[in-house]
């Protein structure tokens, strides 16, 4: 919070998930859109729906404009909280509800052939929405809540030193399906393969403590960023750094690495912002919010009574 307190104007207004309110107000000494006491549930809904899981920049900017927000803050604990704010930000059919969980490489299952190395990341994740795939020339429905992801698989061509299109192993009713993903983010590169489901395999380092010595596997952990997550703002700008340029008016202003990553860097390790060590370690990121000039005041975003706009109870 030192940067917030010392490097932003005194009249700055910070937007973030509600439970950071007291933190920013008391330590950063800045105003916030959402209150740390969870006082206005409807605004939490709007923040969850239009910003954190929002699928377009215009809605996010208009909500923030109505609350005079100058900055957006996201912390790595929001990855674990995604289930909470995506549920709160959903409609009555839970259209934004989703979750993230790491898939950790099983070194013993790494397979090498003459020209390919196959990296296997086992795990378990239920589908957050229906997925229709093609299998042996026919369409197959993998239903949300019933089907799941059992592993993420990434391969590299050892002759060209190029990564190949990743896929996940989906499981439904005892049968496994290989489902190709369109995107791969690995070693600082975002690769678009042009086909596959609109999902990303996000690969980042795993750190192992072996008798007091830290060993780094630079591609040791995977996140499966589902199509639903990929439509959301948090995954696009916080994890992937807006590779599709869908949120250009959010300009990164400050990145504060996690204390664990900072400490390990001070010990000589060259680490990116995200690592897997005693859980996912990631930075605090803060963006300047630059408005387009097309935003308008909407009473719907200022009201505190959701019953005027929603036909279900938050």
Residue ranges of each PLM-predicted region?
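Extracytoplasmic
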Residues: 1-314
